[in-house]
Structures are given as C-alpha cells and as structure tokens.
Amino acid sequence: MHPLPDGVAIGAHAARNLVAAGLDVVAVVKQGDFPLADVLEQEGCNVTMFADSVRGMGASLAHGVAQRRSADGWIIALADMPRIRSSTIALIAKELTAGRDLVAPAYKGQRGHPVGLGKRFGAQLAALGGDAGARDIVAANQSELLLIECDDPGVLHDIDRREDLAPPAADDRA
C-alpha cells in the first residue's frame, strides 16, 4: 500500500473516511495479505479475507456483501479513492437509510464514487463475478439513480498512477 504525501497509506485513508462516516465497514482483502488486513483493522474495518480474488472485483464484492446479507444497503467504496470526504459518504448512507435504492455523489455534474445500493439489489450483488463490479447494476437502473451534488472533488479522484499521489490543487482539496 503506497502512502500519500502525508505518509498514511492510500487504503488507510479511504478506510478512515468510511469509518468516520459512521459505517459498519467490511473490507475484502486478498487471502494472505496480512499487512493490509492489519492496517485496515487498525482503522476500524471488519476485515474478511477472500481466497478467490483472482475471480475479479465482482466476486470480491459479492464476498463482502455476503458478510452483511441482512444490511439495508451497501456502499461500494474503493481503496484507491482516499480523498472522498466522510460527510459525502454519510449523505449516501442517509439516503439509503431513507429508502433510496441507488445513490451516488456528483461533483460539478459528474457522477462519482462511492455508489450506494439498497437492499433490493442484494441478490444481484451477491451473484457478481468478473471485473465489472456493480457497474452493470447501476447502468441497468440508471433511471432510479439519485445523484447528490456535493462540493467534494474527491468523489472523482482515484489513484491509479504515481502522478495521482500529488495533493489536488488548492481549489479542489478534499
């Protein structure tokens, strides 16, 4: 896990923001990745190791959902998006609690992450496989998607390359 400029690992930042939003966070970790599991547990996550992570993000997501089958909904968040504000995550959780089935944040009109899916999508989430994750579920139900416009550029900022590690511009700080 690569650190951000402040020295804290990317995934630890993402986990910290989820926990700070008041969520029961389940983190799915590749079987045997004990260093990552330890970091996430220290941040307050409930860690579950998944032996079949080679089956793709969808299978990992299904494994995580299976850990909380009775939940009223799930917020699908990624470890490579550490700059999403906990207040944004809490807004998504609030809409799920109020009965919304599909919720996502938007920044300047552009849909971001994480995406919240209500209980009605539980069976579909539990059946996922491959690398598409929940993308197909969201696409098939686009007309039901509630976009919450928020002043949080972090919802669009994932860290895929070394250049992405630099702090955002002053007017885009998350």
Give the residues covered by each predicted segment:
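Short glycine- and hydrophobic/aromatic-rich loop-to-beta-strand nucleating segment
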Residues: H113-L117, H157-D160
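Conserved alpha/beta core of the MobA/IspD/sugar-nucleotide pyrophosphorylase nucleotidyltransferase superfamily
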Residues: A123-A174
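Nucleotide and nucleotide-moiety/phosphate-recognizing core
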Residues: M1-R111, K119, S143-C150
